[in-house]
C-alpha cells in the first residue's frame, strides 16, 4: 500500500489520538504506529509513504507539479522502520539552479553536478536501501547496530 505523507501524519494522529511535534518528518513512534495500522488493515509489513515536504528532502528532489511544497519522493517503511528513501530527481537545469538558490546554497559549488543538467539530463530517479535496517527488521532486532558487522555511531568510527 501507499499513502501520502500528510495523510499518514493525520491518520496516525487520529487513529492513535496522539499529537507529534515534528511536522516535516515522522518521529520513530509514528513510523511504528503507521506500520502497525497498515499491518492490521491490509496485512502488509510494508507501506510506501509518498510526497514528503520539499523542505525535508535534498536539493535534487523534484517538487510536485500539483503542489510544489511536496516532492515526488517516497520512503518505504518495513515493520516500523524506514528502510528505503527515493524519488524522482530534477533533470531540468533551470529548475535545479532555482532550487539550489532557494535553499541559500551557492550554485558555484555544484558546477560539476549541474554540468550534466546543461548537457541534457534525462528524467531519472534514485533510491537508497539501508541493508542493515532491512536486516534488523527482518530478524526482529530492535537496534540496527545488531544487524551491522561494524556499527558506527558518534563514539565509534573505526572497527
Question: Language-model segments: what does each one mean?
Answer:
Residues 10, 52-57, 64-66, 81-83, ...:
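Short, glycine-/Ser/Thr-/acidic-enriched flexible segments
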Residues 87-88, 93-159:
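Active-site pocket scaffolds in enzymes
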Amino acid at each position: 500500500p501507499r499513502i501520502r505523507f500528510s495523510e499518514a501524519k493525520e491518520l496516525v494522529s487520529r487513529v492513535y489520538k496522539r499529537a507529534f511535534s515534528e511536522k516535516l518528518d515522522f518521529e520513530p513512534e509514528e513510523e511504528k504506529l503507521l506500520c502497525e495500522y497498515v499491518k492490521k488493515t491490509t496485512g502488509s509489513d510494508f507501506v510506501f509513504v509518498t510526497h514528503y515536504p520539499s523542505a525535508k528532502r535534498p536539493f535534487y528532489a523534484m517538487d510536485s507539479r500539483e503542489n510544489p511544497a511536496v516532492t515526488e519522493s517516497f520512503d518505504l517503511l518495513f515493520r516500523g522502520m524506514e528502510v528505503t528513501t527515493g524519488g524522482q530527481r530534477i533533470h531540468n537545469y533551470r529548475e535545479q539552479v532555482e532550487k539550489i538558490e532557494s535553499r541559500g546554497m551557492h550554485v558555484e559549488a555544484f558546477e560539476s553536478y549541474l554540468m550534466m543538467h546543461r548537457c541534457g539530463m534525462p528524467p531519472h530517479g534514485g533510491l537508497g536501501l539501508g541493508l542493515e535496517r532491512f536486516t534488523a527488521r527482518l530478524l526482529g532486532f530492535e537496534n540496527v547496530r545488531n544487524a551491522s558487522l561494524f556499527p558506527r555511531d558518534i563514539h565509534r568510527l573505526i572497527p
